[in-house]
Amino acid sequence: QPWLPFV
């Protein structure tokens, strides 16, 4: 699971 604060 990648860490993406905003997409």
UniProtKB/Swiss-Prot annotation:
Where in the sequence is Pyrrolidone carboxylic acid found?
A: Q1
Mainly localized where?
secreted
Q: In which tissues is it expressed?
A: Expressed by the skin dorsal glands.
Any one Gene Ontology BP term: positive regulation of smooth muscle contraction
This protein's record includes keyword Transcription regulation: no
Domain of life where this protein originates: Eukaryota
Q: Which UniProt keywords apply?
A: Amidation, Amphibian defense peptide, Pyrrolidone carboxylic acid, Secreted
Report if keyword Secreted is assigned: yes
Q: Where does the record place it?
A: Secreted
What do the Gene Ontology cellular component annotations say? extracellular region
Q: Which residues carry this modification: Valine amide?
A: V7
Role played: Induces contraction of intestinal smooth muscle in isolated guinea pig ileum.
Q: Which family does it belong to?
A: Belongs to the frog skin active peptide (FSAP) family. Peroniin subfamily.
Q: What is the name attached to this protein's record?
A: Peroniin-1.3
